[in-house]
């Protein structure tokens, strides 16, 4: 052991200087460029912990966790907790869902404060015709209606996993499904970015109170990316990472795709063993996926890429998710050993407390990283590692994305700790070599291997204030030093695990005697390489292997000093044989060929007591990917916390008084010398240096004491950094993975005198201009793991001081070394006298949001004690004036106003000029005259006695004999005039004749008119016809008349015979067919009737109204009250004269207007009085439609349709009122529609909603009462009962309504749906929809959406019953 320490002391410091420079350059470059990754918003973090009601974890695609949403799930948060107020101009939405319902549903929605408008959202429609639609909502500020920016038709997604992405870029929206673009649509939007109001909300699985279908099923991914190209890049990275046959797209049901390994920044409490917690995976960045190469490597070329990359995180303590992996690619190579030889080595992971992960036999060991944090918690940015292990065998090639393992917190991801671990015991996602592959350590030939990259955050440099850059991760690139070769043809699952050592140290205050106080540092663990020996056994090519022997245990020794060092975390590499080995922690002697190097840490003792609290960390920078979690319940007041770190950017206070000078700390004791390393082989020859100046020849000097250690020999091939440098040790080096006990300081020897200048050397040969060929490869040397005591950070660069642990015995004189870096920081001095308190600084900036709590954080770590209720705050100030509201509905027509006051009497006008007016219209016909006398055939005239009910005759048939009345007789042959007969005596009463046929009213009117005089100007006197009647043409047969009263028959005595007439035609013949009517003949003689004439019967019923007459439109009413009461009976344009006041009015559209009359013209005193007023002075009203003639005396409410179909801009209330008035319905009718001011269920008066039936215009019952329509069944009615319009047409059959659909804009309970009522019935936009009900369904409230451009049926409801007295 002493020998090794002495050899280590000869380690040249210039090698460490180069490492420091490289690490410093990488860190500075990383800090300058930053790690600004693209912004992505994971919407599943809104679910929070504990899970809300109806939300649970479920096994998702690929066996990874997902969230299951039930019907009652309601996940919503204020949008500002996750979404930036100004949204991305271009973006993409990545989705992985499994719906379990054909109804689809809303995946997410960002709404306004009232949950009426969706600003941004994604929805799956219900299944229709074997297809579904993916709908993207994109509504710009200022709109009051949700806008469907893009709609894509996709196959049915129900009951299967679906992965798709929607990208918005410029004016185009594209849909990608399974990494293939399905379709692309254009949409118009303004140049302004999409902004969200502060009170906006975001919902997952629903859209709040929008009334849209909720999503039921599983959601595994729901992420918004700020770069719309991200889905394509992820797909390309996935394809490039595939190998062999799995080189491109694979069905989701075949290969589980792990898009990203996720480590959460908060861990469960520390326990001896914690089972792995599954967390939902998210997609990795393109840079990470692009590191996996899908290109095949020629067989026989082993490849193991191990690398560590440091990051300068944009902030510390921000709760960002760590997406860091270590990749180890194991490629097929030539077998190095025979089957069963036992020299396959496993790279094991151990920690500083002795935990190890090994495998024996054919066990499958999952790759793990064991992390423990101090006091049971892990700070943000703690080291995290994972590894890929890949074989390029075409048949057994695993998907690299399936080989990612993660570790989080201080819990231990299970590792295999005994030799009989089963192959299927590794957790999901653990890397596993395929059968016929083993991992061995051996020579890798002359091939150079491609380095890979691992990303590891480091909790380091927390107290470094000089550099000004918060560094929480480290980047170091190593060339391959571990070769995994195929050594066996039988199936053996072996993994290689590599983890860099991360040593976190904290000083405890004053220095001690045993070790210098150091600031927290980080050193990457460097790997060692080993080769199989000739005998096939795996040995380390170091002196340590030779001394300790195969499988030997490390010697026991005193415990390490811990007074000034907090518990360290380190992971070392241990070579362990893959087969036939003993239990973990060491090998029995002679049990195998695998030697253990650096196995001081294989045994782990029981957990120690919790360490002291760590020092405060450096304030983190503002986060970019950290979002506020859901608001928790107020907790109880906690105990006063310890003083926090200094707030950022505070104003400097006044300088305090200078403290006393602290005492200088003592110098630490010198550590023991390390073992001497072997001299390395010469490396490549360097370029010649510039010639030196000629010096004087000096005398030989006296030999001085041994000088300081010289530099190492020429570098050979080894652990290159891929930056143009080669690094190799010169001998056996011990793994410096733990602090060592400092030994006593030995005094330095006397300094030698300066030697004389040597003689001038000969000029060397000119070197070539290019680098020479590489020299022969040297034997691989061990790579040291640098302890944290080797590194001090000052001003952002690595500096190395004299390290006793590396000092060995003096080596040969070397060439002068390179200029050294500044020395290490001195030990911390004693605390000075406290100064006077400074002035109070200004209030610090607002802290950053806390970390998101996800499903893997135990509940007991989150809950706090319930806080006391706070006092009520004072009322806030008056808010700003809101925007103007919507224009209100048109109000109902007001009642007629009271008559205005009489105006002042006007001035007397000039006398008008009297002009003869036009001739008046013909007067009405005079009353009919009494029946005339009856003349028999022989000319006897029988006087008719006067009857009291008959009026006097208006004329006589024969001049001079007013008693004669002639009647038309049957036309006979023309005869000669006979002599008038003498007056006969009154005859006896004849027998009663049979009843006559009924008389048509039209024929009766014609008969009466024929009795009137032809000159109607003389209304009361007819003109003599000179006893001659010209017979008109015979009329058409009339309808039978009513039965008249019994008439009186008067038969006089037979008169004297008259003059014989001309002989008639001889003989009798059969009557012929009546001929057509002939032309009118000349006037014939007076008719000679042989029988009495029946008197007219009583007046018949009134006939149908005739055409409008030419009567005067002036109507006389008694007074003003009479005029107002009968306003509905007077048509527009009618003149009204009031008898009591003599005023004159005209009926206009909205009421009455008074007319100014001129000067009174008196009537002469001798003028006869005016005729009496007609008994029916009003303008005849059109008859009611027969459909309105039903008996409405019982209390009912009528449901009537408008006379025409109407689109979305209706003004329906006004039309209902207007058309009801025109139809003679005097009660108030309202539209059967919901509005933005009133729900449909409240249109009818509350007192009449239950007791009155709803009927059509014929009184047929449609609904039992108003409330029965809104019971929730859609308002079912009997489709055999028609619904009539105001003009009496059946809307269910009349072609004037081509679409038998009724607008309503309500849900089944009559509540308005603000997104389904055509913007309060004010628009006919094709893109806007409203709810309507097809009457064919037998429902009046069916929930079907129709474009507001459709012209559909609008119903009107009588909102209250009005009796006849009210009418």
Swiss-Prot record:
A matching Pfam family: Collagen_trimer
Region (Disordered): 267-319, 396-446, 529-784, 905-930, 974-1000, 1055-1089
Localization per record: Secreted, Extracellular space, Extracellular matrix; Secreted
Region (Nonhelical region 6 (NC6)), start-end ranges: 999-1031
Segments for region (Nonhelical region 4 (NC4)): 853-863
Nonhelical region 2 (NC2): region residues: 719-748
Segment forming the signal sequence: 1-31
UniProt key word Disulfide bond: yes
Job of this protein: Structural protein that stabilizes microvessels and muscle cells, both in heart and in skeletal muscle. Restin potently inhibits angiogenesis.
The protein's name: Collagen alpha-1(XV) chain
């Amino acid at each position: 052991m002493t020998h090794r320490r002495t050899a280590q002391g000869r380690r040249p410091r210039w090698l460490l200087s180069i490492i420091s420079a490289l690490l410093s350059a990488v860190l500075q470059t990383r800090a300058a460029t930053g790690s600004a990754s693209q912004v992505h918003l994971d919407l599943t973090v809104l679910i929070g912990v504990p899970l809300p009601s109806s939300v649970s974890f479920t096994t998702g695609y690929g066996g990874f966790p997902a969230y299951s949403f039930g019907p009652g799930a309601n996940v919503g948060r204020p949008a500002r907790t996750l979404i930036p107020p100004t949204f991305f101009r271009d973006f993409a939405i990545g989705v992985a869902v499994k719906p379990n319902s054909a109804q689809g549903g809303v995946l997410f929605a960002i709404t306004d404060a009232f949950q009426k408008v969706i600003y941004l959202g994604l929805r799956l429609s219900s299944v229709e015709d074997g297809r579904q639609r993916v709908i993207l909502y994109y509504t710009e500020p200022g709109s009051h209606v949700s806008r469907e920016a893009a709609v894509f038709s996709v196959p049915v997604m129900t009951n299967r996993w679906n992965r798709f992405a929607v990208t918005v870029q410029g004016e185009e929206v594209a849909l990608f499904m399974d990494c293939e673009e399905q379709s692309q649509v254009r949409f118009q939007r303004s140049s302004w970015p999409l902004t969200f109001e502060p009170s906006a909300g975001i919902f997952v699985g629903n859209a709040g109170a929008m009334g849209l279908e909720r999503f039921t099923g599983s959601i595994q991914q729901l992420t918004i990316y700020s770069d719309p190209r991200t889905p394509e890049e992820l797909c390309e990275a996935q394809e490039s990472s595939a190998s062999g046959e799995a080189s491109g797209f694979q069905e989701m049901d075949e290969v589980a795709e792990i898009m990203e390994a996720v480590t959460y920044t908060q861990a469960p409490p520390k326990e001896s063993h914690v089972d792995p917690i599954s967390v939902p995976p998210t997609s990795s960045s393109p840079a990470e996926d692009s590191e996996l190469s899908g290109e095949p490597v020629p067989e026989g070329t082993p490849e193991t890429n191990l690398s560590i990359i440091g990051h300068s995180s944009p902030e510390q303590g921000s709760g960002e998710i760590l997406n860091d992996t270590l990749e180890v690619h194991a490629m097929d190579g030539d077998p190095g050993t025979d089957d069963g030889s036992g020299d396959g080595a496993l790279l094991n992971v151990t920690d500083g407390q002795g935990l190890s992960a090994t495998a024996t036999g054919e066990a499958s060991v999952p790759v793990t990283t064991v992390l423990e944090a101090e006091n049971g918690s892990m700070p943000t940015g703690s080291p995290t590692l994972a590894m890929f292990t890949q074989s390029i065998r075409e048949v057994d090639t695993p998907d690299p994305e399936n080989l990612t393992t993660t570790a989080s917190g201080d819990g231990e991801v299970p590792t295999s700790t005994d030799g009989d671990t089963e192959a299927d015991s590794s957790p999901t996602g653990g890397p596993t070599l395929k059968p016929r592959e083993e991992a061995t350590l051996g020579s890798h030939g002359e091939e150079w291997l491609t380095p890979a990259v691992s990303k590891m955050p480091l909790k380091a440099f927390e107290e470094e204030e000089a550099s000004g850059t918060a560094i929480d991760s480290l980047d170091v690139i190593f060339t391959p030093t571990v070769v995994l070769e195929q050594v066996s043809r039988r199936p053996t699952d072996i993994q290689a695990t590599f983890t860099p050592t991360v040593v976190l140290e904290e000083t405890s205050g004053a220095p001690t005697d045993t070790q210098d106080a150091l600031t927290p540092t980080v050193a990457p663990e460097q790997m060692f390489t080993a080769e199989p020996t000739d005998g096939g056994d795996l040995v380390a090519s170091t002196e340590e292997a030779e001394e300790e022997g195969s499988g030997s245990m490390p010697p026991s020794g005193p415990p390490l000093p811990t007074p000034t060092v907090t518990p360290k975390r380190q992971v070392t590499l241990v070579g362990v044989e893959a087969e036939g080995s003993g239990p973990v922690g060491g090998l029995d002697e002679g049990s195998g060929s695998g030697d253990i190097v650096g196995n001081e840490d294989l045994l782990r003792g029981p957990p120690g007591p919790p360490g002291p609290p760590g020092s405060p960390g450096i304030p983190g920078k503002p986060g970019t990917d950290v979002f506020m979690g859901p608001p928790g319940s107020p907790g109880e007041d906690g105990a006063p916390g310890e003083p926090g770190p200094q707030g950022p950017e505070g104003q400097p206070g006044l300088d305090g008084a200078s403290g006393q000078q602290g005492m200088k700390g003592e110098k630490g004791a010198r550590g023991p010398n390390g073992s001497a390393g072997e001299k390395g082989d010469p490396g490549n020859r360097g370029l010649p240096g510039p010639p030196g100046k000629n010096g004087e020849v000096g005398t030989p000097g006296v030999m001085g004491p041994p000088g300081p250690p010289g530099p190492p020999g020429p570098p050979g091939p080894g652990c290159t950094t891929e930056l143009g440098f080669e690094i190799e040790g010169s001998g056996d080096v011990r793994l410096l993975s733990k602090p060592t006990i400092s030994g006593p300081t030995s005094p330095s020897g006397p300094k030698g005198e300066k030697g004389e200048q040597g003689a001038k050397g000969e000029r060397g040969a000119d070197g070539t201009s290019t680098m020479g060929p590489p020299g022969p490869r040297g034997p691989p040397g061990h790579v040291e793991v640098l302890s944290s005591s080797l590194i001090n950070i000052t001003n952002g660069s690595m500096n190395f001081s004299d390290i006793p642990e590396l000092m060995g015995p003096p080596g040969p004189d070397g060439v002068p070394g390179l200029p050294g870096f500044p020395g290490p920081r001195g030990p911390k001095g004693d605390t000075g006298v406290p100064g006077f308190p400074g002035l109070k600084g200004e209030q610090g900036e607002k802290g950053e949001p806390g970390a998101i709590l996800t499903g893997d954080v135990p509940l007991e770590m989150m809950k706090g004690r319930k806080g006391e209720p706070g006092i009520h705050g004072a009322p806030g100030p008056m808010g700003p004036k809101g925007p103007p509201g919507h224009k209100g509905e048109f109000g109902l027509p007001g009642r007629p106003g009271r008559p205005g006051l009489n105006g002042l009497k006007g001035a007397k006008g000039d006398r008008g000029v009297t002009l003869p007016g036009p001739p008046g219209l013909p007067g009405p016909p005079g009353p009919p005259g009494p029946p005339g006398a009856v003349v028999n055939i022989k000319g006897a005239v029988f006087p008719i006695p006067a009857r009291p009910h008959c009026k006097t005759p208006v004329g006589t048939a024969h001049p001079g004999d007013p008693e004669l009345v002639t009647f038309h007789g049957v036309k006979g042959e023309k005869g000669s005039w006979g002599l008038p007969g003498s007056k006969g005596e009154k005859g006896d009463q004849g027998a009663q004749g049979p009843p006559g046929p009924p008389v048509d009213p039209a024929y009766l009117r014609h008969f009466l008119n024929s009795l009137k005089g032809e000159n109607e100007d003389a209304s009361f006197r007819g003109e003599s016809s000179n006893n001659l009647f010209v017979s008109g043409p015979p009329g058409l047969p009339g309808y039978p008349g009513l039965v008249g009263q019994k008439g009186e028959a008067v038969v006089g005595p037979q008169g004297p015979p008259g003059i014989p007439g001309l002989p008639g035609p001889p003989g009798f013949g059969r009557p012929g067919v009546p001929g057509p009517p002939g032309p009118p003949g000349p006037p014939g003689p007076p008719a000679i009737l042989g029988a009495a004439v029946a008197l007219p019967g009583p007046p018949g019923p009134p006939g149908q109204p005739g055409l409008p007459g030419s009567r005067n439109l002036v109507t006389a009413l008694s007074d003003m009250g009479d005029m107002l009461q009968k306003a509905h009976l007077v048509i527009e344009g009618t003149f009204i004269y009031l008898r009591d006041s003599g005023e004159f009015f005209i009926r206009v559209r909205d009421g009455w207007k008074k007319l100014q009359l001129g000067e009174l013209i008196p009537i002469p005193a001798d003028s006869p009085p005016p005729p009496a007023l007609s008994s029916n002075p009003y303008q005849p009203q059109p008859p009611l439609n027969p459909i309105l003639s039903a008996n409405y005396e019982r209390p009912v409410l009528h449901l009537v349709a408008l006379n025409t179909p109407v689109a979305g801009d209706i003004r329906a209330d006004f039309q209902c009122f207007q058309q009801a008035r025109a139809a003679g319905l005097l009660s108030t009718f309202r539209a059967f529609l919901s509005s933005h001011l009133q729900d449909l269920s409240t249109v009818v008066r509350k007192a009449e909603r239950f007791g009155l039936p709803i009927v059509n215009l014929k009184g047929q019952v449609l609904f039992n009462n108003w409330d029965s329509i809104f019971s929730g069944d859609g308002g079912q009615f009997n489709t055999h009962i028609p619904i009539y319009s105001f003009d009496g047409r059946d809307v269910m059959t009349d072609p004037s309504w081509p679409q038998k659909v009724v607008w309503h804009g309500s849900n089944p309970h009559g509540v308005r749906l603000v997104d389904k009522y055509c913007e309060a019935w004010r628009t006919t936009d094709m893109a806007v929809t409203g709810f309507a009900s097809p009457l064919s369904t037998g429902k009046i409230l069916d929930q079907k959406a129709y474009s507001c451009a459709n012209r559909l049926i609008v119903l009107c409801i009588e909102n209250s019953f009005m009796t006849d007295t009210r009418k």
